């Protein structure tokens, strides 16, 4: 492989108007072959997340890494590593960010790319179009909320009406633009979280970290309306998890494959 500086020459310091320029490690390639070489180089790094690594640990059915007889970890090749790195590198060049930062904040969930919520907030704050995001939290008091409860029985998906009583917190993400105009997201509420099925999912952080989840969701809603060029049509990791069927039918476990990156729900 040629010298890294030749493979990925530094991008000029003038970044796109919608993003903040990075002062270290932003790379740009000039043709497809250079991009492939750069992606291959990045996939060999131990600093990139699992989805982008050429070699990943083999795990048993309990999620524990397996080892060889000599104690070294068992590894298997990830066939998607180079292509994932290539996509991340392309997005980094388009957005004016360092590829490693994109990889650390772009997750693959159920086959879909998703931004970390912290990255969405940071990108909005750094884009230069607005003042830093603010969050307005209001407690509307205890409320009994009806929702549709779905479940599987004899291979069929059924549903019934159920209720849950909770403190109905609401959140609006807002800021002002350079002209002083107030811009705000739609109101996100715990009632919405229940009715949309986010709250009652197994392991849902809406039950234990309501304030944080409200802020994350409000920021994502704000970004899609007022800064779509930053999100590029990609949802937050929290949203993608919540969009997955709340009650999927269980299926037999298949042979071990390279697993998608496992990340906590409060990213």
Sequence positions of predicted segments:
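Glycine-rich anion-binding surface patch
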Residues: 2-267
């Amino acid at each position: 492989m040629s010298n890294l500086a030749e493979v990925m020459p530094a991008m000029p310091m003038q970044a796109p108007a919608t993003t903040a320029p990075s002062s270290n490690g932003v790379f740009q390639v000039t043709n497809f072959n250079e991009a492939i070489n750069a992606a291959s180089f990045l996939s060999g790094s131990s600093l990139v997340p699992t989805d982008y690594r050429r070699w990943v640990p083999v795990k048993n059915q309990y999620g524990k890494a397996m080892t060889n007889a000599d104690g070294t970890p068992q590894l298997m090749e990830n066939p998607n590593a180079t292509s994932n790195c290539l996509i991340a590198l392309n997005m980094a060049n388009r957005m004016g960010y360092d590829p490693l930062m994109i990889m650390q904040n772009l997750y693959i969930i159920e086959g879909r790319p998703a931004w970390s919520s912290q990255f969405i907030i940071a990108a909005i704050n750094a884009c230069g179009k607005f003042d830093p995001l603010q969050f307005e939290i209001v407690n509307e008091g205890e409320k009994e909320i009806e929702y549709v409860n779905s479940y599987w029985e004899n291979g069929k998906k059924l549903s019934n009406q159920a209720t849950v009583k909770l403190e109905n917190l609401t959140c609006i993400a807002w800021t002002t633009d350079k002209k002083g105009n107030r811009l705000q997201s739609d109101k996100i509420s715990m009632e919405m979280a229940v009715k949309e099925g986010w709250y009652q999912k197994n392991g849902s952080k809406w039950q234990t970290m309501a304030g944080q989840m409200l802020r994350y969701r409000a920021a994502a809603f704000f970004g899609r309306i007022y800064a779509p060029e930053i999100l590029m049509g990609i949802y937050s990791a929290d949203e993608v998890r919540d969009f997955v069927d709340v009650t999927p039918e269980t299926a037999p476990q298949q042979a071990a494959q390279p697993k998608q990156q496992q990340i906590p729900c409060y990213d």
